[in-house]
Amino acid sequence: MGSVPIAEYGTPSTAEIPDHIEKYLPNYDAILLESHGALTWSADLLSAYHKMESLEFYAEVLYRTQMLGGGKELSGETIEKLYEVRRKMNLPGKHPANL
């Protein structure tokens, strides 16, 4: 899934929310809506659902990690190696991890 940005708060039932998320649509698969919740999208409903399930799982892991004292940040070199593995495996996704 890659990184998940946080969109600026928008008043419910107004154009503020779509205006704030529009810039993220071409480059991301998911977004957190400040003070609202999460949103995922894909070519079909089932794929979008699976992305939401993944996002919720990662959020739970992050929460538990923080409760246990925090995680260890990966080095830039390690992250680049992971991106290279992703490219070699031709994993799909529109997010910035497609370097």
Give short role names for the model-derived ranges.
Residues 1-99:
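Glycine-rich flexible loops
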